[in-house]
Amino acid sequence: MIKFERICAYRVVKPQPLLTNNKIASSSLVRKLLQKGKLEKANKILNRNWSIVGKVQKGRQLGKKIGFPTCNIDIDDYVLAKPGVYAVKVLRKNSDKYLKGIANLGYRPTFNQKKILLEVHLFNFSGNLYNKLLSVEFLKFIRKEKKFNNVNQLRTQIKKDLNIAKKTK
C-alpha cells in the first residue's frame, strides 16, 4: 500500500495500538480476561457488554422445578467466559426492551452435568421463549460455579445471587 501512495494520491496512516494497563487491547486479551472471570475489564476494552446470541432450547426443566425457570441458550460456537453466575440483561429479537436477569454459565455440578450450558432466569417475566433468539449481555461476574450438597442449598444460594444481580446496573 505504501508504494502506491504517491501513484494513487492517498496517504497511509499506521494506527497506534489501543493500550489498556500497558497491554495492547486485542481479541486475545479479551478472551483471556473472560476466561479469568474479569468481565468488567473485558467489557471496558470492548466498549460494550460481552454477549452471546442464541436460540432458546427445551431443557430438563430443573430450574422450573426448584422455583427459578430458565431459558437454556444454545452456545456451541462461542468463546466462553469463566464458568459461573452472572448478572445479565437480555434482548429478544424484534424488541428494544431489555429484560434483567441472572445466568449460570457452566456445567451445573449439583446435577452432575458434563456439557456446558447457558441458563438464564429472567426477572419479572413469564411466557414461552422456546426457539426464540435472545441476545444475552453479561454485566457482572457474581461467583464461580459450586457443587451443592442438595437442592435446598442451591436454592438458598440462588436467592442470594438474585439479590446481587437485581442491584447490578
Identify the residue ranges that each predicted region occupies.
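Phosphate/ribose-recognition catalytic cores of enzymes acting on nucleotide-derived substrates
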Residues: 58-169
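Glycine-rich, Lys/Arg-enriched anion-binding loops that position phosphate/diphosphate groups
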Residues: 6-104
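Charged helix-capping and loop-helix junction motifs
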Residues: 1-2, 119
